[in-house]
Amino acid sequence: MMRMLKKIAGWSRKKKIIVIICVVLTLVLGATGAVFGYAASKVNKIQKIEVKKETLKESITEEVEHKSGYLNVAVFGLDSRDGSLDKGSRSDTIMIVSLNQETYEVKMVSVYRDTFMRLKDGSYNKANAAYSYFGPDGGVALLNENMDMNIEKYVSVNFNALVDVIDAVGGMDLELTDAEVVHMNNYCVETSEVTGKSYKKIEPEVGGSYHLNGVQAVSYARIRYTDGGDAQRTVRQRIVLLNIMQKLQQMDLTTINKIADSVFPQIATNFSFTEILNYAKDFQKYRVGETLGFPNVRYSKMLSGVGSTEIADTLASNVAEVHQFLFGDTDYQVSGTVKGIDDEINDALSSGKYEEADETEKEDEKSEDKTSEETNHTETNIKVTEDGNTGTDSGGTSEDSSTGSLTVTEPQQPDTETPPDYYEEDYYYGDD
């Protein structure tokens, strides 16, 4: 990160600062895309979707004394088929990015998308349902209410943007296991359909070092069905992120300009251009620190009508850990709001309202997964070229993992005005 913040020959100080803050707020912090800009004419291409003032007022708990000197930003990586970055788009990546304005350290909390949490309307569901049903309002409210945060700003990036950026920087070299090769090939079918970009299928499907283009790298970052599940997916996302970071140091202004034209329309935020400049004055000093998964202490449970979920061992203890991690608060006392949500989750689970799916339901889900994986493994109507991508710089590592099941179904747009009572695992875009 520090090397990235060094001077880029020929760029003015203002241009470099704006580039840095845009990168920090999107690429570095979202693991889902990148923004590069150096003039208002470029930044104006970004979608402006505001968060309602009443949402902020209602979701930020007044009893919590939030520490000053931090800029906390919500970052969402979206799987949007129509380019819309408002409600109706599922957030596969959910992160809290905290910028310490005194020590210049950037810390990140990755919220597992399957985490069972309370939505802004009081219902309970998976974390990624919040953005799908309510847009940025719902995503920001989710983090504030469930985690005692005071987030007012967000950045959302479409997965298509990440494909474009990876291709623009020449792809990346990654070490893949046997299982990752199989699942990446499967995900490439859908990713190629959605983005309209081609890829080269890896054959034979054995582990090793491979050069991946944008479609392949994004598909790799989406893999879930290996050991570690959703948590391991966040590791893969960070691997892709760090590889792109290494590539950024070699980019010239012409390439940056092309990426901005392609990527900016695939980004939404409520940051103004003026705010970016105001926050940018010290960004040459910022460095990326550690990342924490949330909930860190958790267990998995199959809930009837909801699907596979991650449930905090206790929400209160996990929230306290987040505040210690981000703000160094070793004696943090969670708010009454978090305690209430914790109690409601425990009551709902113990009451049988979300009684665990019976064996028949589980077998049906496994059967659907298997059928979908076999179907997607055939590249029907997909253009698969022999030329993968150009560029051989940088590398990365991944964790060992083993085989699992995969399902990617045809998308069905949910009714975003009247959301269903539950968010089934494959209700929207499939269980990926």
Please provide the spans of the model-predicted regions.
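Entry/capping segment at the start of metal-dependent catalytic domains
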Residues: R3-Y104
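C-terminal solvent-exposed extensions
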Residues: L56-E63, L119, Q266-D387, D393, ...
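Extracytoplasmic
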Residues: S68-L71, S89-I94, T103-V111, G122, ...
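Structured segments of extracytoplasmic/periplasmic soluble domains
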Residues: F76, D82, D114, A141-E152, ...
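Second-shell loop/turn segments in exported
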Residues: D82-L85, N125-Y133, D148-K153, G207, ...
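Extracytoplasmic/secreted envelope proteins and their assembly/folding machinery
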Residues: T93, Y124, N128, P136-N144, ...
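Amphipathic, coiled-coil-like alpha-helical scaffolding segments used for oligomerization/assembly
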Residues: Y133-G196, N270-S272, I276
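Flexible, polar/acidic helix-loop-strand segments at domain edges
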Residues: D167-T255
